Curated annotation (Swiss-Prot):
Gene Ontology BP, a term: succinyl-CoA metabolic process
Any GO MF annotation of the entry: magnesium ion binding
Sites where the protein binds Mg(2+): N209, D223
First-level EC class: ligase
SUPFAM superfamilies linked to this entry: Glutathione synthetase ATP-binding domain-like (SSF56059), Succinyl-CoA synthetase domains (SSF52210)
Subunit-structure text: Heterotetramer of two alpha and two beta subunits.
Pathway: Carbohydrate metabolism; tricarboxylic acid cycle; succinate from succinyl-CoA (ligase route): step 1/1
EC nos: 6.2.1.5
Biological classification of the source: Bacteria, Pseudomonadati, Pseudomonadota, Alphaproteobacteria, Hyphomicrobiales
Cofactor note (record): Binds 1 Mg(2+) ion per subunit.
Protein name: Succinate--CoA ligase [ADP-forming] subunit beta
Amino acid sequence: MNIHEYQAKAVLREFGVPVSHGYPIFKASEAEAAATKLGGPVWVVKSQIHAGGRGKGKFKEASAGDKGGVRLAKSVDEVKTYAEQMLHATLVTVQTGPAGKQVNRLYIEEGSEIDKEFYLSLLVDRATSRISFVVSTEGGMSIEDVAHDTPEKIVSFTVDPATGIMSHHGRAVANALGLKGDQAKQAESLVTKLYTAFLAKDMEMLEINPLVLTKQGDLKCLDAKMSFDGNSLYRHADIQGLRDESEEDAKEIEASKYDLNYVTLDGTIGCMVNGAGLAMATMDIIKLYGMTPANFLDVGGGASKEKVTAAFKIITADPNVKGILINIFGGIMKCDIIAEGVVAAVKEVGLDVPLVVRLEGTNVEAGKKIIKHSGLNVLPADNLDDAAQKIVNAVKGA
């Protein structure tokens, strides 16, 4: 689960991490009060969306002006003007795609006198089962670009969970950033606090970009992105309360209500499969035959008729779907249950696109019989290869 920048900074503040003061606003009329409380003389007006690249982004609406999603203001009136322009406008960044995201909240933050910008992040290293630090002197940039163009400017290391964070980890960060004396001590303290916060809140990723050294000689987290392990949210009611569903895909939210593993993709073939491995193989073979999947959808091993019906409705709610492939290998999951769910869903929501069904395994004959006698226009398939070819040909011929 992701949260907004201002929320992430509030979490960091709980652990004593140095961040700038600021106030979130949801209406343009709140901008003046926020700016006045901060006092100036310089403010930063930041769009709050779950996407990076805000500063270099562009708004779709001409009324929002030609500046990006992060703007420097030198007067209270300028803060008010930017708030009026940016709120409820659509911001397009490298991470939002061409559709962009509507800005429904802003963060008014005090300005900082920046001397240097750095990059610092913590993430779960799946290969070592440890927390990894990634550090670079190239802050304020896309770390992917730095890794591609100047990989030698990136330093990374992992923390042994048996010992936890230690002073030498802080020194490693300070050395990587070229910090000495008091600034090196600040880096050691910062690293300890970030690691403590990461563990305490069950984060998956914490990115500070940029981490800045101010002209006053202080380290400060100027931006913060946080992602949390969804499996741990039951023990973090405070974090759950920060969820902004308007930033999430509506179909993915609906799928989560039924414990369906659903991810929206950008293709045209909807997929319903049981098992993550089979789902990925199904997507691969669709690509092999020249088309792209519209989603990843794993209904799991013990899906009910109602769960299958919900899954089918979610797929058909995507206007980009031009055909649907259902690929079920029944082990725990019974093929007749899948068939009943599909028939019920089609009768309820209708079917305007080709549908190919491949069933194999437990109660397969009963499942095929249910579909055959349903009166629905369904193309049966004998195996995965046959199913993929049939759905691709059906969509191309539609």
